[in-house]
């Protein structure tokens, strides 16, 4: 089963866009050109019969600009005030863009209690199902104006985690995180020239978490650990997840066409299928790793280069075979 086959069957899709994807880095203002392109992509997915849920960052940034604040809010109260001002303005922009295509949208603001409290969760799920049945595009954000860290239910902490929880809540088939990174590497590519891009993750284990910046890693790629944690939530719930760079918003089209864009984290179901199909190749690569570990008297960089050469000699890009391989 290749990537195109996996993605062709996706019907209920959650797409998260980060602040850096929909704003200008220099000014913090909304990038209306990119946001309009994003909306057109979503409309096209809807026209294909897909159910689409958007998780959108940006409320705090929009509120900060509206309030004339030059710097990011330093206190929780200031952040929540910015979110309260910005959320309505952000939704107004989305609504105006979607209205050009006669597409209805709905604002859905969640707190952690919406997921962890049984009754709240039930109501939230029913709301999403009904909105999708009515052909409405839900636009989701955390209710930052009232979310807290310390009380019984806490908060999501970041929109990657929020998006994963939404995907789990609605039984989504696919979660796409559009962010400021290409995907996942075996090491920080800014520090290690031998870092390899990982196209597909079959299984999330401790070594992969270390690559993402866990306690065992010396080369964490900022923000990647939250994305791996999001992948654990989504894939455990049966959704595949893709991390891709939001600089090119049209990458969403390429993803849905099955092109090798970003890093694909396979759900447990698809992971087992892929595991079986790739077993012979993975066995070969494990032998190469074993020989690599036995190497003595060579620098780490030299050994890594040698391992990569062995990969290429064997005719495979084994970064994509990740899952108890590295």
Residue positions per predicted region:
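C-terminal catalytic "cap/lid" subdomain
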Residues: 1-72, 76-104, 108-326
């Amino acid at each position: 089963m290749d990537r195109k086959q996996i993605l062709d069957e996706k019907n209920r899709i959650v797409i998260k866009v980060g602040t850096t994807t929909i704003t200008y880095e220099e000014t913090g203002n909304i990038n209306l050109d990119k946001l309009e392109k994003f909306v057109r992509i979503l409309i096209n997915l809807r026209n294909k019969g897909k159910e689409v849920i958007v998780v959108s960052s940006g409320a705090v940034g929009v509120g900060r600009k509206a309030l004339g604040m030059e710097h990011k809010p330093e206190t929780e109260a200031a952040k929540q005030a910015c979110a309260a001002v910005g959320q309505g303005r952000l939704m107004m922009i989305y609504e105006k863009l979607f209205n050009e295509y006669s597409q209805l949208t709905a604002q859905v603001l969640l707190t952690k209690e919406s997921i962890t409290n049984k009754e709240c969760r039930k109501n939230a799920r029913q709301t999403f199902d009904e909105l999708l049945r009515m052909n409405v595009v839900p636009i989701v954000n955390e209710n930052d104006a009232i979310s807290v860290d310390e009380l019984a239910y806490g908060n999501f902490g970041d929109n990657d985690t929020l998006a994963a929880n939404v995907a789990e809540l609605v039984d989504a088939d696919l979660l796409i995180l559009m962010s400021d990174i290409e995907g996942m590497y075996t090491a920080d590519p800014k520090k290690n020239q031998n870092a390899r891009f990982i196209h597909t993750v079959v299984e999330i284990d401790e070594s992969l978490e270390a690559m993402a910046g866990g306690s065992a890693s010396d080369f964490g790629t900022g923000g990647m650990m939250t994305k791996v944690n999001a992948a654990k939530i989504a894939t455990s719930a049966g959704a595949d997840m893709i991390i891709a760079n939001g600089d090119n918003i049209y990458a969403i089209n390429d993803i849905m066409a099955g092109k090798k864009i970003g890093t694909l984290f396979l759900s447990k179901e698809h992971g087992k299928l892929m595991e079986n199909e790739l077993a012979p190749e993975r066995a070969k690569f494990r032998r190469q790793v074993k020989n690599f570990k036995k190497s003595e008297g060579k620098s780490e960089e030299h050994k890594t280069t040698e391992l990569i050469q062995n990969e290429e000699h064997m005719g495979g890009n084994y970064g994509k075979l990740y899952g108890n391989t590295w």
